[in-house]
């Protein structure tokens, strides 16, 4: 799905809801499915949209910045957040933990900002479930799943990125 088509869908959703109701837009896909690219295009096209910075225990990739791309945590700090119930969702994928802080998402929604979340498939499912219990999230939620054009293209993307082991491909 191109960012232009997705942007059009989000625009329609924003117009059908209550005036000034912020949206929580979940973009999910398999690893290498284009989540980051689509999110970057959406953020460039919709200046009023902001992304929620998520937490991870994985190593920093080239060009990533603390607090802008992710909050990079050690395993002990991440576990403390899990135990405190601070995450809207969290999961371990290929040995690395990822999580979305409730305060990060709800704070931005309460400021009237549309929030974009780039999450894995597990994370999107968890957020959809939890949103049913939190009216503020349920009202704001728009969930989009991206599929790659083909499995061969997905494998090519993952190989080109060079961050996954051959066993994980």
PLM region spans:
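N-terminal phosphate/diphosphate-binding loop that engages ATP/GTP or pyrophosphate donors
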Residues: 37-86
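ATP-dependent NMP and nucleoside kinases share a basic, alpha-helical "lid"
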Residues: 79-86, 100-161
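Residue-level preference for the first positions of well-ordered beta-strands
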Residues: 22-26, 114-116
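Small-molecule kinase domains that catalyze NTP-dependent phosphoryl transfer to phosphate-bearing small molecules
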Residues: 163-169
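Extreme N-terminal, non-catalytic leader segments
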Residues: 1-24
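Conserved glycine(s) of the Walker
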Residues: 29, 34
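Hydrophobic/aromatic beta-strand patches that form the interior of the parallel beta-sheet core
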Residues: 25, 52, 71, 142-144
């Amino acid at each position: 799905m191109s960012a232009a088509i997705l942007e059009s869908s989000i625009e329609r959703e924003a117009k059908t809801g209550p005036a000034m109701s912020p949206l929580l837009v979940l973009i999910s896909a398999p690893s290498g499915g284009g989540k980051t690219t689509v999110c970057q295009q959406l953020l460039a096209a919709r200046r009023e949209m902001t992304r929620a910075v998520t937490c991870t225990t994985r190593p920093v990739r080239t060009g990533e910045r603390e607090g802008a791309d992710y909050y990079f945590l050690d395993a002990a700090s991440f576990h403390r957040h899990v135990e405190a119930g601070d995450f809207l969702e969290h999961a371990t994928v290929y040995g690395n933990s990822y999580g979305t802080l409730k305060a990060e998402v709800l704070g931005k929604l309460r400021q009237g900002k549309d929030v974009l979340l780039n999450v894995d498939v597990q994370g999107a499912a968890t957020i959809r479930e939890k949103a049913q219990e939190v009216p503020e999230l349920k009202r704001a939620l728009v969930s989009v799943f991206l599929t790659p054009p083909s499995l061969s293209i997905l494998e090519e993307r993952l190989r080109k990125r060079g961050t996954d082991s051959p066993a994980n491909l």
